[in-house]
Amino acid sequence: MRWTHLLLPAILLLPAMLGIASPACAHAFLLHASPPVGSELPVSPSAVTITYTEGVEPDFSSIEVDNAQGSRVDKADPHLLNGDQTKLSVSLPKLPPGEYTVVWHVTSVDTHKTEGRFTFSVTP
């Protein structure tokens, strides 16, 4: 019976010792943005698309684009790009020159919530 006291902890610790990570520990972070973070564009983009490190739930996620005065300028239509759960996109009207702030909030497929913001500019 004494050997079971030693064996049980070893069995329970085996996944950690092998480096097996639980998928529940993951979060959806910004991997890539189009337009790129901090970019200066000569023309207005037609959309903002963010690629995340894992899939997101579009019904519980958002991307908002605000102008320098803080007014929302996107078309309020966040959607998965081509059905890819890692790519959330929002359409834009033709934007005048200026600086824009992208604010995003996502819930990943494992229900973790993350958020962030970045800017881009449309130059005259």
Regions found by a protein language model. Name each.
Residues 48-50, 54-76:
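Short, surface-exposed alpha-helix to beta-strand junction/turn motifs within ectodomains of secreted
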Residues 86-90:
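Short strand-edge motifs at loop-to-beta-strand transitions and within beta-strands
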